[in-house]
């Protein structure tokens, strides 16, 4: 499991919106400058977050983006699954994966199952509020 730039940037954007949350919409340009992320890249990430209703956005004068919930209500796992897809460490544990023909004899499967469980459990336990500290 390697978290892509999209996943890392999505977390940075969510933290930025949380840290500057006064109820107003924050212009994308300001977020991009503070986070040193290109506007072009943000234009690909923000719609994903909006469509999942993690943030809301308004176009035009006075527009921008803001959180839809309190920072402590956003679990990191949800954001990363949205931007990364399945977080399984190996293909045979991905959601909807066909059963591997070696499952019955695979000596490493218990390792991957436990790693997957621990990673997901940890990411479920961390919120945006935790990352603001």
PLM regions: where:
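Beta-hairpin "wing" of winged helix-turn-helix
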Residues: 54-67
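N-terminal helix-turn-helix DNA-binding core of bacterial DNA-binding proteins
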Residues: 3-5, 9-37
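Short, hydrophobic-biased segments on the C-terminal half of alpha helices
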Residues: 46-47
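Residue cluster at the C-terminal edge of the helix-turn-helix DNA-binding motif
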Residues: 51-54, 82
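Non-DNA-binding regulatory cores of transcription-related proteins
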Residues: 68-133
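Alpha-helical residues within the helix-turn-helix
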Residues: 33, 50-51
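Key DNA-contact positions within bacterial/archaeal DNA-binding proteins
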Residues: 40
